[in-house]
């Protein structure tokens, strides 16, 4: 499909392949200007990926500097896709770094117009135009995606023909420089190693006593290192291939040879033990001789009596020397025993502890963690009361259990009474007149006489009527309260 100017549009599948291949590089997954992730807009002249905010900045610069397109929404021509086939954020960044444009790659405090009108940006634009022109000459009417396009460096301006010739030359040089190892190398090695045999010591000096250890023929043959002359060494140039690394090969050993090797190893171990024992015994003898010489030198300055005493007790002196040597050997053995690692023989779990103490500590910790348990005694005892004090709860302070019990007993006698007086509560005796009515503190009968009519001697009937009305009023109020509470409970249901 083509437009009026003759430009060929690419299919959506080709466009997706180009940008998917471009997104395989991590540097192409961020904006080239600000560093935001997942950019979907592009600067076509420079072949870089941009975010939507930076695309607005590029759109304001002008088409003579740059123009933007969406990688997912717009249609793309083949020539525009060539710039992203051969470009990308990673190649533009490499070009800027290698051409003194590092300060322009900073994502902050860099003007976009200054960045894209700089000499480095202009050089990169010209460089990308040349690469696009070469690709158009190779593939004029189609877009071919090769694996080499993403690996080409931005500074590589040589032609593809020169690259192919250089590759062919490098291959020819590699195979021309390759040389097979000569078959007579083993014979040369044998001759040279034979010439390096040690010469016999012709001097008159006596060699020091050393412990000679026999080695197996197989081990010595495998450990020999070949020695090459200067003529046999290969000269490697810079253009030639790298040296072939030497490989270590293992030789097969027969069963009989393996048994001989094990026997030889045992003999060598026994020989080493014997040598250590002889060295230790020789050291003890040398020390004993030193003690003898020192003792003889000290004995010369003493008087004759001391000499006679020493001569009479030679056995004790020899025993002393033997004891010192034995003590030295024992101390050495003790040091060896302390240095050798040993496992302590313990019980289950290989830990030293006291199970009883641990169990007690665990029980105490559980008790502390649990705290006091709720038994319900407090609710049973004080559930009907409206309030209690801490002294009453714990039985301390001004609280008296006997007085409290007596008060409860007195209150039980007034369970059915509507009202009580202090005299009836405390059990005080009331004065009664001749009619059996209680007498007030004023001296007149409260039920029969009033203070106003005490002089006339008549009975006041109004007082009794008022009392009856008051009682009737109280009964009505109580009934109304009960009826109201009943209706309230009914409505709540």
Curated annotation (Swiss-Prot):
InterPro entries with a match to the protein in the record: ARFGAP/RecO (IPR037278), ArfGAP_dom (IPR001164), ArfGAP_dom_sf (IPR038508)
SUPFAM superfamilies for the chain: ArfGap/RecO-like zinc finger
Assigned GO CC terms: COPI vesicle coat; COPI-coated vesicle; Golgi membrane
Biased composition (Low complexity): 176-192, 199-217, 297-311
PROSITE patterns named in the record: ARFGAP (PS50115)
Keyword line: Golgi apparatus, GTPase activation, Metal-binding, Phosphoprotein, Protein transport, Transport, Zinc, Zinc-finger
The keyword Transport belongs to this UniProt entry's keyword annotation: yes
Location of the protein in the cell: Golgi apparatus
Name used for this protein in its record: ADP-ribosylation factor GTPase-activating protein GLO3
Biological source species: Saccharomyces cerevisiae (strain ATCC 204508 / S288c) (Baker's yeast)
Taxon lineage: Eukaryota, Fungi, Dikarya, Ascomycota, Saccharomycotina
